[in-house]
């Protein structure tokens, strides 16, 4: 059996640009991509914390150190400048490997400041 598992996550980044007329994709600071292990042109799912929209696109690299998160093309209708996003990539791996798999989770605060890197999502408690 093959399972689809969380591979990389950018948690609570802020949209810095939104360009309806760009040909598509989501431009992400190359440093952020590296931290989460997301490759340029890799499929990503985006979850907008502010409006509940969930959509899929692909990642393209923005200049390292720029802190850019630019939602482009048709997806620009799903996110406005200042919105808080969760950006995820997934990997398909055999069941045996899935049981010991650890994602790369990057937490952000403020104006796209990387806060910390983790290898798991915290257990939710009551």
Swiss-Prot record:
Subunit and interaction comment: Heterooctamer of four alpha and four beta subunits.
Substrates-to-products reaction catalysed: L-aspartate + H(+) = beta-alanine + CO2
Active site: 25, 58
The entry's keywords: Autocatalytic cleavage, Cytoplasm, Decarboxylase, Lyase, Pantothenate biosynthesis, Pyruvate, Schiff base, Zymogen
Binding residues for substrate: 57, 73-75
Entry's Gene Ontology molecular function annotations: aspartate 1-decarboxylase activity
Xref: InterPro entries: Asp_de-COase-like_dom_sf (IPR009010), Asp_decarbox (IPR003190)
Gene name of the encoded protein: panD
Cofactor(s) the protein requires to work: pyruvate
Cofactor annotation comment: Binds 1 pyruvoyl group covalently per subunit.
Modified how: Is synthesized initially as an inactive proenzyme, which is activated by self-cleavage at a specific serine bond to produce a beta-subunit with a hydroxyl group at its C-terminus and an alpha-subunit with a pyruvoyl group at its N-terminus.
Pfam family, one: Asp_decarbox
HAMAP family membership: PanD
Family: Belongs to the PanD family.
Any one of the GO CC terms: cytosol
Compartmental location: Cytoplasm
The protein's annotated pathway: Cofactor biosynthesis; (R)-pantothenate biosynthesis; beta-alanine from L-aspartate: step 1/1
Superkingdom in the source lineage: Bacteria
Keyword Cytoplasm annotated: yes
Modified residues (Pyruvic acid (Ser)): 25
Protein name per its UniProtKB record: Aspartate 1-decarboxylase
């Amino acid at each position: 059996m093959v399972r689809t598992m969380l591979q990389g996550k950018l948690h609570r980044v802020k949209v810095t640009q939104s360009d309806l007329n760009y040909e598509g994709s989501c431009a992400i600071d190359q440093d952020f991509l590296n931290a989460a292990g997301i490759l340029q042109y890799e499929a990503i799912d985006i979850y907008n914390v502010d409006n509940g929209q969930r959509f899929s696109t692909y990642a393209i690299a923005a200049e390292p150190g720029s802190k850019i998160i630019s939602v482009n093309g048709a997806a620009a209708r799903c996110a406005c400048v200042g919105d808080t996003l969760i950006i995820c990539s997934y990997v398909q791996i055999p069941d045996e490997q899935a049981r010991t798999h650890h994602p790369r989770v990057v937490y952000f605060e403020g104006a796209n400041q990387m806060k910390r890197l983790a290898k798991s999502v915290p257990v939710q408690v009551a």
